[in-house]
Amino acid sequence: MPIKESFKRIKSDHQNQNQDQINYVDENVKENLSTYYLVKRISFEYSFKEFLNSDQYLSIDTSIIFSKNIMNALYYLHSNNIIYADLKPSNILIDSKGIFKLNSINNSILIENNNNNNNNNNNNNNNNNNNNNNNQQIMITSRQQIFNLYNNNIDNDNNNNINESIYYLSPEVLKGYTYSFSSDIWSFGVLLFKCITGYYPFYSNDATKLIESIIYDNYLDPIIRLPSDNNDLIQQQHFNDLISKILEKNPQKRITWPKLFIHPFFKNQQTQQVNEIINKSSNTTLQLLNKSSSSSSSSSSSSSSSSSSSSSSSLSFQQQQQPNNISSPNLENQVIRLNKVKIPPLNISQTNSLNDFSNLIENNNFTRLISEFDHSIDFEASPIISPNRPSSPPLSSLSSCSSSSSSSVPIIFNKTIKDLQLLINNNNNNNNNNNNNNNNNNNNNNNNNYQEIIEYFNFISKFIKTKTTIITKLTLLNYLIDLLLLSNNQYSSIIEKLLIIINEHTILIKQLVQQIKISNDTIIKVKIIHLLGIIIGKSNNLSINSKDSIIQLLEYLNNEISSFNNNNNIQLSLKRKLVSTFGEILFYFSTLDEITLSTKWGILSLEKYINTLLNLFLINDSSSPSSSPPPSSSSSSSSPSSPSSTSPSLLSSIPNPSLFPQISLSSIITTNKAIDKTILLYLIKTFDNLLITRPIYIKYFSIKSKQLLNQFLKYIKDDNNLEDELNNNIKISSSSAFYRIIKQQPILSLSLIDNCNESVMINMIDLNQHWRVQISFLNILFILITINNNFIDDNNNINNINNNNNEFIKKFLEKLYNHYINQKNQINPIVFKKSFIFYSILKDFNNNNFIKIN
């Protein structure tokens, strides 16, 4: 019988041939025409999980051997475009010779159509009509067991038997993103940490808190329990460094194979043969491992294969070159995760109704369709300037919005998504051969598309309410976020439809707001608030139909921000999203006129909400707006020598300080480590956008404007870490808000002279500064020059203060000339043009005095 013959051969191979790092699945053995059998090698090994349970932790020497075996196995899989995706002790076996081996690839992911794949694979995939993308990852079998939080009942919070896989999942996977080679390296790091220290780097008895800890918290101190006899201090240092590089939450910064193999922690006589893999990368992976095995009797590798009885197709490990970037798959790779059955990518246009989706949810077979993207934001909100927010009709009608920046920018800083496989059909009807027929067809297609999207969001709203795993919900929320952040013009029409329908049919917004209130999972709240912020930030017009939900959200955010005092990492992430989404709502409402705001939205004033943001950094003062006495007539009079006597028009533009709240924003600008820089950035951007749409809001910032402006200068001057993109964006937003304050209260620019000199101001326009920062300060300089000219009387009599200012400005302009004009090839063209204008002004100096500027 074929089965018996195959059984004998496998048993003989196991007993007599080389020992593998990977137990392979043998080829299909055909018993008869209708039945296929999956034959595996008989295993006489010992479970590594049982070994750890008995011994708790490993010595350094044993850990080195363990690491070498597991790294060889993972490297072999990655070189063949396979992500193991479920590394944990129960999936590792130890044979009688002490060799550690991976036991199964049942949950692994095969990356198809990699650039290194042969033409046959490409041709096969091109013939697959269900695959519209040439770069795909396919889940080999079901991953439902991995996504369950608890081993027995996922909804039983009292059950502390947490699914073992959760401890080893990487932060990006727990956030709902796809697996990558880097995810396997993270899992290896957790495993190595557990083996050497005896405890997990992240631990909790509650599965939800465990997930939050992995995503947001720092790992525990890695303490070696059984160091070698010598150099235990050096070993500990190397181990600390290794763990810091493996357990890096950003997968783009996580250590890769070349650096991992040669890390000092693994440098000893037992692992010298591992380095041969790096030195001979021109050979195929199989050849490398065979050569490596010849240098050591403790390890060798063999090819692995698997077969599927459902498809009768085998997974073969091709002999191929090592991928160029083995640390992560192609960012354009799509992943299709299959549960129990192989389902093609779903398209709403291919279904008659959404019942198919509902059935998938009820049967727990929801197809998870997401993409591999650059995770470097958000993973927390990445400080990358997004495209300008689309102008809404209220914004376009504002005549007072002239500034150095032509438009506002989103408060929420996000990654920009370039491509995403849509679950929604995107029909572009551009052919107009027959006007009448085509118009009718276009209308019908548009109506069908709208109906599809409506059904799609009805399905999503229903799904969000279901009781399913956190990871599944996070996957769906991440898909929606990525969908709305698409920058590809190809999808602009579909995104526009999405936003219109989200606002017109408010079921999704209502359900999201409701989930924020009732959900006990902070990580889910973070994602939902983030999603709502993007919806509001990208919407040109919020429908009045969503009034109740938006107002509820506004009040919820206002109350949460006011009472927020928790500083752990997950709460900090929540606070960031609270502030950013709150800022997006305030910015949208600030674009509406007072009548629309009060009659349609029922909001008489935004002052309460703006003060909530200000109170994040409020310094208590005995004075308050309510206690401040009304200005007396004498207080409004000016002495004959004051500048106001010569320029009443200027003074009339300055609001009365006694009407302002007693606040100080100086703590925003200082480098106090207690202030989260991301929240600082969101806050400053909110203020900046409010000053664009409603310059009258300057009154909220004016009581200590002089101190505020000097603090802005100090912050921009002192922190010149140009490698930190977050710092750069803080500088840009700070200088922009700084300019708007000066523009609305020009006389405040005179205060810059008190604690400033030309070296400080030159620093503001230094070539190393971002060009937007330079432009803002050049505009401020122009205001400063203009004010000084306005204070020159008909007899060219200038008081001492203004004379000093003139001298300062002259010196500054001379510096400007030397700084910019002589280095015009090194500066931004816009900055050069602006600086050349100021150089022309320099020629109008006469006897250290200004000539009036018309």
From Swiss-Prot:
The chain crosses the membrane at residues 770-792. Residues 292-322, 633-650 have a biased composition (Low complexity). Keywords: Glycoprotein, Membrane, Transmembrane, Transmembrane helix. It is a single-pass membrane protein. It is found in: Membrane. Glycans are attached at N32, N106, N163, N279, N283, N290, N325, N347, N365, N414, N520, N541, N620, N757. Belongs to the protein kinase superfamily. Ser/Thr protein kinase family. PANTHER family: SER/THR PROTEIN KINASE ULK4 (PTHR46240), SERINE_THREONINE-PROTEIN KINASE ULK4 (PTHR46240:SF1). The protein kinase domain is predicted to be catalytically inactive. This is Probable inactive serine/threonine-protein kinase DDB_G0274821. It comes from Dictyostelium discoideum (Social amoeba).
